A protein has these predicted regions:
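Gly/Pro-rich turn-and-neighbor structural signature
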Residues: 1-3, 11, 15-18, 30-33, ...
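Short, flexible loop/hinge motifs at secondary-structure junctions
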Residues: 1-93, 161-162
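General secondary-structure edge motif
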Residues: 15-19, 52-56, 82, 96-100, ...
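Generic amphipathic alpha-helical segments used as scaffolds and interaction surfaces in large
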Residues: 23-30, 103, 107, 123
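Intrinsically disordered, low-complexity regions
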Residues: 41-42, 48, 96, 174-176, ...
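Conserved helix-loop functional segments at active or binding sites
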Residues: 45, 63, 78-82, 86, ...
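Active-site-adjacent "gating/activation" loops or surface patches in catalytic cores
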Residues: 61-113, 186-199
């Protein structure tokens, strides 16, 4: 049974145009005939039919090899060499784009690290779950200054919305799960015609004890 929806709730069946911002690749398929197949006459242009097809180009790995030539002075033997480029994680071969992909997959797309490891293996690169976990921890440390600034902004004097979310957490070694908490603090003053950007700050606690929000809100007034 398929009830008839009111016209206001019906979704339009018209196909939306593909975003103009997407990169485009043009292929021209010309007729095989160089002259009219009926009479042999010369062919002239009569316009062109255009159609579009949306395609997905899968992410691919590449190795960026950095070479730093060493130059020696012929007079005093002084050696000149460019400095080593900085890396997101010291002594790691993970590039910034790869780290962004791992973190976005885990926290924005809810793609567990072991699943990401399987995906990368199908692409020909063996990245273990342990390796991805170490990278995730290292990126978390890199983002701590941004995390602190976000907390300061959200908990400025004024109105703050707060809530907590139950989160299942697996206990290491036991295979059992327990319920932890994510405390959510939101600054959103759009209803008061404020032009300040909205922001959300999350804090984790292993349980729901009140001592945690008390510590998070220490120094806050509003």
């Amino acid at each position: 049974y398929d009830p008839v929806l009111p016209s206001a709730l019906r979704q339009s069946s018209a196909r939306k145009p593909l975003p103009a911002s997407l990169p485009r690749q043009t292929r021209v398929i010309r007729p095989e005939e160089e002259c009219c197949p009926v009479c042999g006459g010369e062919l002239s242009s009569l316009g062109c039919d255009v159609s579009e097809q949306l395609e997905l180009i899968s992410s691919t790995f590449k190795v960026i090899e950095t070479q730093r030539p060493k130059l020696a002075c012929c007079r005093c033997d002084h050696i000149v060499q460019a400095p080593v480029p900085s890396k997101p994680i010291v002594r790691s071969y993970a590039g910034p784009g790869l780290l962004v992909h791992v973190i976005t997959g885990k926290y924005a797309d809810h793609l567990a690290l072991y699943r990401q490891s399987e995906i990368y293996r199908r692409q020909g690169v063996d990245l273990s779950r342990a390796t991805l976990g170490r990278w995730t921890g290292a990126v978390a440390e890199l983002l701590e200054p941004l995390y602190d600034i976000l907390r300061q902004y959200v908990l400025m004097p004024g109105k703050v919305h707060a809530d907590n979310i139950p989160v299942p957490v697996q206990e290491p070694g036991s295979g059992k799960t327990r319920i932890a908490r994510l405390w959510v603090y939101v600054r959103d003053d759009r209803n008061a015609d404020s032009e300040m950007p909205t922001a959300v700050w999350f804090a984790y606690s292993p349980d729901r004890k009140g001592i945690y929000p008390q510590n998070y809100l220490a120094g806050y007034s509003g």
